[in-house]
């Protein structure tokens, strides 16, 4: 439903021959604690860089204190498909996904663009935007990539504008 901020789908039970409405509702939570927020790091290459990046992000957001024994109650959901991650945001389970593998690999001097997301991976981003969430570049700009199968894409998705406003300036400050 373009412009309404509401997304409704149908779930079909093929065995029973019934269906029911599914409403896509991203989390309205203004905080990350006790929720899922993920920095993508699927393969061994770049995990150290991405892990350090993630720790700095939580530190600068005031949610992690270096040297503290306090456990950060924020969970990861390393869902291997970008469309699946957007579905988790739409379901209300996840609050944020950051995919900056392209920046990590470039900073490490690696040509690993084939191991990053591509435009087709993000074909579901319009659904999240219509439901009230957001998908953008790590620098807070709209995604503007050619629709092909080779262009590497970095992206960030938020469940709601409150989280986006909180993270966006910190994220920009951490990027090379």
Model-derived regions: residue spans:
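An extended, acidic
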Residues: 2-176
């Amino acid at each position: 439903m373009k412009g309404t901020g509401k997304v409704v789908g149908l779930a079909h039970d093929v065995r029973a021959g019934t269906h029911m409405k599914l409403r896509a509702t991203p989390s309205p939570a203004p905080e990350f604690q006790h929720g899922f927020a993920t920095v993508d790091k699927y393969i061994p290459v770049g995990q150290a860089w991405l892990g350090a990046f993630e720790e700095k992000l939580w530190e600068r957001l005031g949610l992690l204190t270096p040297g503290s024994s306090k456990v950060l109650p924020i969970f990861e959901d390393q869902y291997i498909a970008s469309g699946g991650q957007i579905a988790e945001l739409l379901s209300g389970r996840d609050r944020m996904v950051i995919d900056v593998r392209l920046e990590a690999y470039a900073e490490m001097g690696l040509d690993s663009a084939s191991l990053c997301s591509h435009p087709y991976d993000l074909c579901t981003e319009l659904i999240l935007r219509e439901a009230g969430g957001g998908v953008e570049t790590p620098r807070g700009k709209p995604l503007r990539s050619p629709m092909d199968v080779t262009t590497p894409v970095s992206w960030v998705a938020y469940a709601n504008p409150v989280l986006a406003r909180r993270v966006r300036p910190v994220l920009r400050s951490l990027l090379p």
